[in-house]
């Protein structure tokens, strides 16, 4: 057995070199994927938060108006038509989660129009 301070050249076997390369490659890949996911997640949150906030506020106003007026059947209908399943239907969003509509979500706009009519009656 040689001393670690000897000037002998340390030789790794080809299998050790392959293993070290693979381990470093995997570690680098995982670090890259993790960083990309973190950045994408934050970007998606930053882009989606204002849209989601506005949707929630608008839908909440609709529900609040209907509840405040005691319009139980209309509120049930609004809850059905403004459910998250319908609001986030593929027809309203691109594959990148951007809205396909301009301005107000079409389902929200329909209910805002209905409420405007109710207010005039």
From Swiss-Prot:
Transmembrane segments: none
The keyword Repeat appears for this protein: no
Localization, UniProt: Cytoplasm; Nucleus
A GO-annotated cellular component: cytoplasm
The entry's keywords: Cytoplasm, Nucleus
InterPro entries in alphabetical order: Essential_protein_Yae1_N (IPR019191), Yae1-like (IPR038881)
Any GO BP: protein maturation
Domain of life: Eukaryota
Chain residue ranges for the region called deca-GX3 motif: 28-68
Subunit structure: May form a complex with LTO1.
Family to which the UniProt record says this protein belongs: Belongs to the YAE1 family.
Function: The complex LTO1:YAE1 may function as a target specific adapter that probably recruits apo-RPLI1 to the cytosolic iron-sulfur protein assembly (CIA) complex machinery. May be required for biogenesis of the large ribosomal subunit and initiation of translation.
The protein's name: Protein YAE1
Gene encoding the protein: YAE1
